Each structure stands twice: as C-alpha cells, then as structure tokens.
C-alpha cells in the first residue's frame, strides 16, 4: 500500500532524519542502526521512502511504503531497534584486562627464556609484596557472601579440599622422592617439588573456571579461599611432614609469613570493600591490568633468575618431573570428581572445576617460602618452573574444554 505525502510533510520528515543523528552524537550514545537506516525509514514504523520524481527540488513528492519485512530494511527482526549502547571507556577496557592473561603468561615465559635481563630486576625481595598484591585483589573483589557459598555445596568443597591437601601432597611426595632416588637429583630439588605440593590452590584456577564454566566460578573462589585461609597451618605442617627429615623447616616462620602474605592482604581487601565501598569501587577497575602485569613479572622473574639452573643438564629432568606432577594432579582431580559426582546434572563442569583446583597450585607462595626459609637456592627451582608449567597447562585445558563445549552446543 502506498501513501502520497505533501511537500510540507516531506520537508518535516527530511529535517527530522537529518537532525536525529546529531542528537544521538551529542548524547555520546550510539544507536544500533545500520549506516543507511536514516535514509530508508521513518521513525514510526519500518517504511521505505522513495521519491516519485528524480528531478531535483524540494517540491518532490515522496511515497512511503509500510513494510513488515525488517530484513529488507537492514534490521534484525529479533533486536530492539531503539536499544542504546554506551561506547566502551578506557576503564571498561581495563576491567577486561584479565582476558589476555594466558597470552601474557606465554609471552613472559618466552621473553624470560630469550632475554633473561628483562626480568632479572624483579628480584626475590619483590616476590612477597607481589603475591600480597594479588591476594589483596582477591579480597577486594570478594565479600562475605562468596565464603558463605561453601555451605551450599559442602560435598564439593570437601572434595576440593581433599584434592588440595591429600591427593596433591601424596603426588608431590612420590615425584619428589623419584627425583632424588631414580633421577639422582640433589635433595633440595626433591624438597622443592614437595613444597609445591603443600601450598594452597592458585588464584588462576578461579579465572580458568570462569572461562569454561562461569556458573561454578563462585564455588571455585570458595574452594581456593578456604585452602588459602587454612594454608597458614596446613602448609607448614605438610612441609614438616614431607620435607622435615630432609631439610630443616621453620614452621613458626612459615605461619607468620603466610599470615602476612595471604591472610592479611585478603582481610584488608574485604574490610576496604565493606567499610569504604566508594574507595574500593574507585580502585577496582585498575586492579585487573595491575594484576596482569604483576603476574607477568611473577612468572618471568623466577625463570630468568634461575635460567642457568633451568638450562643446566638436569633442568630438563626437573621440567619433566614438574610437568608430570601437574598432569597427574589435573587427571586425579578430574577422575576423582567424576566418580563422586557421576549422577550430578553438572558433573562435567564439576570435573573441570575440581581438575583446575587440584592441578593449579600457588607456586608463587611456594617460591616465596623457598626463598625465605631454605638456604639452598635449588629448593626454589621447582617452584619457579612450576609457576610457568602450571599456568601454561591450565590455560591449555581452558582452550581445549572451551572448544569442546562449543562443539557440544
């Protein structure tokens, strides 16, 4: 059906269409319209506007055709044509900095191997404050509700805890013993592998879970937080049990150090979030990019500082043992969860989450403890290698499982 409009209506329509984009621009918003929408439609309904005559002049009459076909107008039929979106700001982009973390880990590893001086300035004295900053970021992005999530799925929390502080230490003891007995490596190397197995879960496991199964990210945070909070007692005790007969372990010193590096920063972040929400909201957008840079230094520096040991004849053997330890931990967490939650509706997602929790350790904490409480620098080599291996293996699984999920759906 066609309608003949008057010249006055034509002028009004043309002026309206000409002024509308300016009003949109001035409000700093972008309409979700294709570029040619203003020349093809009126404001009230999907209409096609064609001039009757191709002779120039403002007295041309225009025909308006009412149409129900949005596709020929260049619009998505299921979309809201008047939806408004904001232009992403620098702060918004900074909030998403964590999305490049896997690439940053790989890049810092390669850079540390190719040009070690790029990270050697980040000496061992910076490890403790760097790890403390990451813990502070965890605290400021959490609240008491995150910890209360533990009571909703106690069975999963218990299984994650068993994986962290029973399955993993047993694997660490086996591979640490094999390093000394079978591969004839120095005793401090075996002690370093055992130390890695005694620390709490890595915060990167929370992000890995978020990338593959966002719905279980809160559960992952609770499991990691509980293992981190209790590490103040469990890690020194396990270290004494597994390493004490081989090397002296300062239990009191470890407890004090974990309190300062882990518990205090998390508590500070929680308190700041609770008591001064405006301050925490102001600094929260900057934490992802700072955390990524912090993690890059924490991954590259241990590798660069121990480059001679890593590239030594027994460096490949240590790399093999650490890789096998993490691979065994990933597999143990995956299949143990599958046997316990085989009938759960989200069994596969639970398997992936518990696999991350068991396979990814806070190797930075192990490195900080090795640097501070063991005189032999060889103890720090397995944690340094573990930092890189654990990160690369974890995010490789993220890529594999994400692709698997997309193919399933």
Curated annotation (Swiss-Prot):
Disulfide bonds: none annotated. One of its GO terms (molecular function) is glycolate transmembrane transporter activity. May function as sodium-coupled metabolite transporter across the chloroplast envelope. It is a multi-pass membrane protein. Residues 1-49 form a transit peptide. Belongs to the bile acid:sodium symporter (BASS) (TC 2.A.28) family. It is found in: Membrane; Plastid, Chloroplast envelope. This is Probable sodium/metabolite cotransporter BASS6, chloroplastic. The gene is BASS6. Keywords: Chloroplast, Membrane, Plastid, Transit peptide, Transmembrane, Transmembrane helix, Transport. One of its GO terms (cellular component) is chloroplast envelope. The chain crosses the membrane at residues 100-120, 121-141, 170-190, 191-211, 221-241, 253-273, 285-305, 316-336, 381-401.
């Amino acid at each position: 059906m066609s309608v003949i409009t008057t010249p006055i209506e034509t002028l009004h329509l043309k002026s309206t269409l000409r002024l509308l984009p300016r009003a949109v621009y001035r409000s700093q918003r972008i309409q979700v319209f294709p570029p040619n929408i203003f020349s093809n439609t009126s404001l009230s309904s999907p209409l096609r506007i064609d001039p009757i005559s191709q002779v120039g002049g403002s007295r041309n009459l225009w025909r308006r055709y009412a149409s129900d076909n949005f596709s020929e107008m260049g619009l998505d039929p299921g979309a809201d044509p008047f939806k408004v979106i904001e232009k992403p700001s620098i702060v918004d982009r900074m909030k998403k900095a964590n999305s490049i973390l896997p690439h940053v880990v790989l890049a810092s590893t390669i850079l540390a191997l190719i040009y070690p001086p790029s990270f050697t300035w980040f000496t061992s004295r910076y490890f403790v404050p760097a790890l403390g900053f990451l813990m502070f970021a965890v605290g400021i992005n959490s609240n008491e509700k995150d910890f209360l999530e533990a009571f909703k799925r106690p069975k999963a929390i218990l299984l994650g805890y068993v994986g962290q502080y029973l399955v993993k230490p047993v694997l660490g003891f086996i591979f640490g013993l094999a390093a000394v007995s079978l591969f004839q490596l120095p005793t401090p190397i075996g002690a370093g592998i055992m130390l890695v197995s005694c620390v709490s879960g890595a915060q990167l496991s929370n992000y890995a879970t978020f990338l593959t199964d966002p719905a279980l990210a809160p559960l992952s945070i609770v499991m990691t937080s509980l293992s981190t909070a209790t590490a103040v007692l469990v890690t020194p005790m396990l270290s004494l049990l597994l390493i004490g007969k081989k090397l002296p372990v300062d239990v009191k010193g470890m407890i004090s150090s974990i309190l300062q590096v882990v518990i205090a920063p998390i508590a500070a972040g929680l308190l700041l979030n609770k008591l001064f929400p405006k301050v925490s909201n102001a600094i929260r957008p900057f934490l992802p990019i700072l955390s990524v840079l912090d993690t890059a230094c924490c991954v590259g520096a241990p590798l660069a500082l121990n480059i001679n040991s890593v590239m030594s004849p027994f460096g490949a053997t240590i790399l093999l043992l650490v890789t096998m330890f993490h691979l065994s931990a990933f597999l143990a967490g995956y299949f143990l969860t599958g046997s316990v939650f085989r009938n759960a509706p989200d069994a596969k997602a639970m398997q992936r989450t518990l696999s991350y929790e068991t396979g990814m350790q806070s190797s930075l904490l192990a490195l900080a403890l090795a640097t501070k409480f063991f005189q032999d620098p060889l103890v720090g080599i397995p944690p340094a290698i573990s930092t890189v291996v654990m990160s690369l293996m974890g995010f490789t699984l993220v890529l594999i499982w994400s692709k698997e999920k997309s193919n399933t759906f």
